Amino acid sequence: MHMFAAFYFVIVLTIEKEWNISYDQLIRLWSLGALLIGLGAIPFGWLSDKWSRSGTMTIMFIGMGLASILCGLSTSVSFLFFSLSLLGLFCSIYHPVGIPWVIHAANKQGRALGVNGIFGGVGIGSGAFVAGTLTELLNWQLAFILPGLISIIIGFILIYLILIDKISYKNYFIKNDDQDHSRNEMILIALIMLLSMFALGLSFHNTQTALPKVFEIRIGNTSSIQIGFMIAIIYFISGATTFVGGLLADRFNLKTIYLIGIFLQFPCYLGIAYISGYSLVVLCILAAVFNASILPTENLLLGKFTPQKYHGVVYGIKFILAFGSGPISVFLISEIYSITLEFTYLFLINAIMMAI
């Protein structure tokens, strides 16, 4: 999912030149897709609760593949907008479905979420690298189409494994350890997490979406492959630290880990706002590491304070906040770039959110 959601941010740099349309106009085409990654989370989470998590995942793989192929076949702005929106809708399936799938299939939940996070980081990083490489060696159309075909194949492999009972069609649940919490405690935790999930989601989208263009501007003389490679390194490393974050979540106080991880992002974004050259890449790595390492903690906190039977819907709500901030991010990036031709104010916004 992360791989497919990351393709356009690199590919758009080539489309900008081929179609002779400005970056701020083209990046807006992702607005509805970014919104649907959030809005699709609740209905697909509900579907997985009522039907089957593994079955819903097959819809994701096949749907993402078809949508990505349509993106590659686009010859107009309107059709590309439609295809990207469809891609965002199918990308919305993973988090409200996949996270509960992982949690309920594991004994050490923090460790399991950490391993899952490694692949999330690899997906983001490889998405940029694959898109940059295929665009440079072949063309931007095949950068969408080839991964789309692979995703469809994976979807049918998953269907086959379900049919032969290698993967369960039914939903698993861990031993019931739902806890009773006071109303005031639940409200306080909910408010804090709502604010933090939105802020973390917006800062993540701001960074992931703008980074290819930021590197093009501030590092200079970089090809699509080089930009994709640098972004791949950033998210490969951050994905690995998600595993470390999962181990910490199994051993230490969840609230403490969460607060420290948020605060440490503040100086990173402050530096990113002003620094150029390869030092910028180092700061981006640190920001991504601190952002990714607290994700297992966040998911465990959310699961701890909500009933298991509603986890699909609950995680759907979470990802509406986290990914529903995507259109706001696209708007900010488009407006800030069109006015300043830079992204300093974008990363200052990130820093302020982490400080608050």
Regions found by a protein language model. Name each.
Residues 39-77, 249-252:
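Conserved MFS/SLC helix-loop-helix module at the cytosolic interface between two early adjacent transmembrane helices
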Residues 8-9, 189-239:
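Extracytoplasmic gate region of multi-pass secondary transporters
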Residues 20, 52, 73-78, 107, ...:
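Helix-breaking motifs and short loop linkers at transmembrane-helix boundaries and internal kinks
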Residues 6, 34-42, 124-125, 235-243, ...:
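Residue-level signature of mid-helix packing/kink "hotspots" within the transmembrane helices
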Residues 83-121:
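Cytoplasmic helix-loop-helix junction between adjacent transmembrane helices
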